[in-house]
Protein backbone atom coordinates (compact mmCIF):
# COMPACT_ATOMS: atom_id res chain seq x y z
CA UNK A 1 0.00 0.00 0.00
CA UNK A 2 2.90 2.34 0.74
CA UNK A 3 4.30 1.69 -2.72
CA UNK A 4 0.96 2.70 -4.26
CA UNK A 5 1.01 6.05 -2.45
CA UNK A 6 4.62 6.59 -3.46
CA UNK A 7 3.82 5.94 -7.11
CA UNK A 8 0.75 8.17 -6.86
CA UNK A 9 2.78 11.07 -5.46
CA UNK A 10 5.43 10.65 -8.16
CA UNK A 11 2.73 10.60 -10.85
CA UNK A 12 1.16 13.80 -9.49
CA UNK A 13 4.51 15.60 -9.38
CA UNK A 14 5.42 14.55 -12.92
CA UNK A 15 1.99 15.53 -14.26
CA UNK A 16 2.46 19.07 -12.92
CA UNK A 17 5.48 19.61 -15.19
CA UNK A 18 4.88 21.11 -18.59
CA UNK A 19 6.45 18.45 -20.79
CA UNK A 20 4.75 19.45 -24.03
CA UNK A 21 6.63 21.14 -26.84
CA UNK A 22 3.68 23.16 -28.14
CA UNK A 23 4.26 26.72 -29.27
CA UNK A 24 1.66 29.48 -29.28
CA UNK A 25 2.23 31.97 -32.07
CA UNK A 26 0.61 35.39 -32.06
CA UNK A 27 -1.67 34.76 -35.04
CA UNK A 28 -5.44 35.07 -34.80
CA UNK A 29 -7.50 32.32 -36.38
CA UNK A 30 -11.06 31.08 -36.79
CA UNK A 31 -10.23 27.52 -37.78
CA UNK A 32 -7.32 25.11 -37.78
CA UNK A 33 -6.71 25.23 -41.57
CA UNK A 34 -5.71 28.90 -41.18
CA UNK A 35 -2.90 27.89 -38.80
CA UNK A 36 -1.16 25.31 -40.97
CA UNK A 37 0.72 27.73 -43.29
CA UNK A 38 1.54 30.04 -40.35
CA UNK A 39 2.97 27.14 -38.34
CA UNK A 40 4.99 26.08 -41.39
CA UNK A 41 6.53 29.58 -41.49
CA UNK A 42 7.10 29.78 -37.72
CA UNK A 43 8.50 26.36 -36.82
CA UNK A 44 9.00 24.56 -40.12
CA UNK A 45 6.18 22.02 -39.73
CA UNK A 46 2.57 22.41 -40.71
CA UNK A 47 1.25 20.79 -37.55
CA UNK A 48 -1.06 22.97 -35.51
CA UNK A 49 -4.57 23.93 -34.59
CA UNK A 50 -6.66 26.92 -33.63
CA UNK A 51 -7.36 27.19 -29.89
CA UNK A 52 -9.19 30.13 -28.31
CA UNK A 53 -8.65 32.24 -31.41
CA UNK A 54 -4.84 31.74 -31.48
CA UNK A 55 -2.70 29.30 -33.41
CA UNK A 56 -0.98 26.53 -31.48
CA UNK A 57 1.87 24.76 -33.29
CA UNK A 58 3.38 21.35 -32.58
CA UNK A 59 7.02 20.66 -33.52
From Swiss-Prot:
Region spans: Interaction with Ca(2+)-activated K(+) channels: 48-55
Signal peptide positions (record): 1-22
Keyword Disulfide bond on entry: yes
Keywords: Disulfide bond, Ion channel impairing toxin, Neurotoxin, Potassium channel impairing toxin, Secreted, Signal, Toxin, Voltage-gated potassium channel impairing toxin
Pfam families in the cross-refs: Toxin_2 (PF00451)
UniProt-annotated site: Aromatic residue of the functional dyad, residues: 58
UniProt key word Disulfide bond: yes
UniProt note on tissues of expression: Expressed by the venom gland.
Subcellular localization: Secreted
Cystines in this chain: 29-50, 35-55, 39-57
Site (Basic residue of the functional dyad): 49
Listed GO CC annotations: extracellular region
Gene3D superfamilies on file: Knottin, scorpion toxin-like (3.30.30.10)
Main location: secreted
InterPro entries found in the cross-reference section: Scorpion_toxin-like_sf (IPR036574), Scorpion_toxinS_K_inh (IPR001947)
GO molecular function: ion channel inhibitor activity; potassium channel regulator activity; toxin activity
Family note: Belongs to the short scorpion toxin superfamily. Potassium channel inhibitor family. Alpha-KTx 04 subfamily.
Function: Inhibits with low potency Kv1.1/KCNA1, Kv1.2/KCNA2, Kv1.3/KCNA3 and Kv11.1/KCNH2/ERG1 voltage-gated potassium channels.
Record remark: domains: Has the structural arrangement of an alpha-helix connected to antiparallel beta-sheets by disulfide bonds (CS-alpha/beta).
Protein's UniProt name: Potassium channel toxin alpha-KTx 4.5
Organism: Tityus costatus (Brazilian scorpion)
Upper lineage: Eukaryota, Metazoa, Ecdysozoa, Arthropoda, Chelicerata
Amino acid sequence: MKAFYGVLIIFILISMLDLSQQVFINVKCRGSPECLPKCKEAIGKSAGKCMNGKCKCYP
